[in-house]
Design a protein with these regions (language model features):
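Beta-strand/loop edge motif enriched in small/polar residues
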Residues: 1-167
Length: 167
């Protein structure tokens, strides 16, 4: 598990509220339930956009359930480490990947649906940690998932993939 302190991707390091991390995977940040996030996101600079829902270092004591992200500029939901579970999530027509995790997220994903059009990204982009000495690199449990892509007419050829797994 990542135990250092990091900054949320895209937010300047001078912004203290963008810092996350630590050693408490049981952290409870409250409840996020029955939420629809629509037409969100923002392009801060080249290759630096805001996700529909960013979960950075959020602990397993937090409840995230029945979430919809629709037509976001970048990823629908992205995790940066942490151990929060996300159940009953629908991500549709986003500009990049539907479900994207990085930096050794260690939670549960269950009952997910991704629907992308020809301009969207993959159903999932799943990465572990870039630290070569971190074990396990990534160990979430993901079940009951459906990815529906844009088909063979996607604008970006690599977006034909339902899922990309690295690290």
């Amino acid at each position: 598990v990542n135990t250092g302190l990091f900054n949320v991707e895209g937010i300047p390091s001078t912004e203290g509220r963008a810092e996350y991390g630590g050693t408490n995977n049981d952290d409870n940040s409250g409840v996020l339930k029955y939420v629809s996030i629509r037409h969100g996101g923002s392009k801060l600079e080249a290759n630096n956009e805001i996700n529909g829902l960013t979960l950075a270092g959020v602990g397993r004591g937090t409840e995230v359930d029945f979430i919809e992200v629709y037509a976001n500029l970048d990823d629908g939901i992205e995790w940066f480490g942490g151990a929060v579970s996300v159940k009953h999530a629908v991500v549709s027509f986003c500009g990049d990947d539907s479900f994207d995790y990085d930096q050794s997220w260690d939670g549960l994903g269950q009952f997910w649906l991704s629907l992308q059009d020809e301009e969207g990204g993959r159903g999932g982009e799943w990465d572990g940690s870039e630290a070569s000495d971190l074990n396990p690199k990534v160990s979430p449990l993901i079940t009951n998932v459906t990815f529906i892509g844009g088909g063979l007419t996607t604008v970006n050829g690599d977006n034909n993939d339902a899922l990309r797994i690295r690290n």
